[in-house]
From Swiss-Prot:
Record-listed ATP binding positions: K245
Protein EC: 6.1.1.17
Source species of the chain: Parvibaculum lavamentivorans (strain DS-1 / DSM 13023 / NCIMB 13966)
One Gene Ontology term, aspect cellular component: cytoplasm
Name of the protein described by the UniProt record: Glutamate--tRNA ligase 1
Cytoplasm among keywords: yes
Motif 'HIGH' region, residue numbers: 11-21
Location(s), subcellular: Cytoplasm
Length: 449
């Protein structure tokens, strides 16, 4: 397939995006970016009972947060005429036929087939109906749903992830494309959009493989050629269960992760490498991530998303962030204490918002922990005059060691507790010049400063 690729991310605005949806969007975006192609956002909103403008707006907000800006946009609810035209062609060609069974009748058929050891495949009884039969059923108040008549053949395609794939049409029921109330199900609008927008590559989860075999038949029935397909492994939760919009929104929705303070590029970095043999590496640029992206490296086995892994990558991303990148966000938090402050604290950040906590350690008020007042008094007396720099800590602690005889942990931990009120934190050689002599002396004296 020649020319620049066109890919699409096609969410249904019936709920919030979770990390599995984000992975689908990211793969399509990175593939387009790497190959100088177009990334399309398509709202699959034909389910007007469950689709809402609020969910649609939330999807766009989530993608913007991730940095995944679309080049093309479509909304299926605006394209019903195109789907009607495609359905009319399929009806005229005898590929779309009316069926009148109720859900209960179909369920009884399936149970009888399974009881006889047969696969629960629709028996095409509707194809045997005469015009008189159909008229009688409609007079009874029944409205037809419309099924696509599959060719009972093996549909083969070369998948960029799975390799050679075949879907046996004889093992499938003829899919329903139009409901009794005239609304379109997912399949036909998706096919028509892929044709009309010249989508070259469909990149989606492996749960769509069977559906792809069906869609290829519909595409060809409409006189078009199918795109290239890539079906990657599915992303499960940490317990190994598939993610869902309904059940996992509180834990794994993009909104929840954003509200928790995770960096968008940390999530992008993790999702881009999960399911590949490559180590996850923190990355602060989508261009850099796209340059590394190789769709052939995606695996076939389902994988798990663990928030603990995201926390590790988030920390690593913050460690890579320059002061110039951090400066406006520090200012927004009210804790821009300068480049030296940022360089001192960033090795200890898990979330960016932690910077505000370390600013309070520097500026106070800090409630010091004084376990040995005599030691603290000796340390205060040994404080050198300002100005201070990174060498001050070593000079001061040498003086305290000489004055008290303390060394190792017995020397350093009481100083940390007195200066910060904490048992851990950034290196004190970097924090001490930021705290300054006045605050350091006060804290060593047991004062909350």
């Amino acid at each position: 397939m020649s020319g620049a690729p066109v890919v699409r991310f096609a969410p249904s605005p019936t709920g919030s995006l979770h990390v599995g949806n984000a992975r689908a969007a990211l793969f399509n975006f990175l593939f387009a970016r790497k190959n100088s192609g177009k990334f399309m956002l398509r709202m699959d909103d034909t389910d007007d009972e469950r689709s809402t403008v609020e969910f649609a707006a939330g999807i766009e907000e989530d993608l913007t947060w991730l940095g995944l800006r679309h080049d093309l946009f479509a909304r299926q609810s605006d394209r019903l005429a195109a789907y009607e035209a495609a359905a009319a062609k399929l009806k005229a060609d005898g590929r779309l036929y009316p069926a009148y069974e109720t859900a209960a009748e179909l369920d009884r058929k399936r149970k009888r087939q399974m009881a006889r050891g047969l696969p629960p495949v629709y028996d095409r009884a509707a194809l045997a109906l005469t015009d008189e039969d159909r008229a009688k059923l409609e007079a009874e108040g029944r409205k037809p749903h419309w099924r696509f008549r599959l060719d009972r053949v093996h549909t083969a395609f070369d998948d960029l992830v799975q390799g050679a794939v075949e879907v046996d049409g004889a093992s499938l029921s003829d899919p329903v494309l139009i409901r009794e109330d005239g609304r379109f199900l997912y399949t036909l609008p998706s096919v028509v959009d892929d044709i009309d927008f010249a989508v070259t590559h469909v990149i989606r989860g492996s749960d769509h493989i069977t559906n792809t075999g069906v869609q290829i038949q519909i595409i060809r029935a409409l006189g078009a050629e199918p795109p290239v397909y890539a079906h990657y492994s599915l992303l499960n939760g940490p317990e190994g269960k598939p993610l869902s919009k309904r059940d996992d929104a509180a834990r794994f929705s993009l909104r929840a992760l954003r509200d928790a303070g995770f960096e968008p590029m940390a999530l992008n970095s993790l999702l881009a490498r999960l399911g590949t043999p490559d180590a996850v590496e923190p990355c602060l640029s989508l261009d850099e991530l796209a340059a590394r992206f190789d769709i052939s490296r995606l695996g076939r086995a389902d994988i798990r998303f663990d928030p603990a892994d995201l926390a590790k990558v988030n920390t690593a991303c913050l460690h890579l962030m320059s002061y110039e990148e951090a400066k406006p966000r520090l200012a927004a938090l009210g804790c821009d204490l300068g480049e030296a402050f940022w360089e001192a604290i960033k090795p200890n950040l898990i979330l960016f918002s932690d910077a505000a906590d370390w600013a309070r350690v520097v500026e106070g008020p800090v409630e010091p922990v004084i376990e040995n007042p005599d030691f603290a008094a000796a340390a205060a007396a040994a404080l050198p005059p300002e100005p201070w720099d990174e060498s001050t800590w070593a000079l001061w602690t040498d003086a305290v060691k000489q004055a008290t005889g303390a060394k190792g942990k017995a020397l350093f931990m009481p100083l940390r507790l007195a200066l910060t009120g904490l048992t851990h934190g950034p290196e004190l050689k970097n924090l001490l010049p930021l705290i300054g002599r006045e605050r350091a002396s006060a804290r060593l004296g047991g004062l909350t400063r």
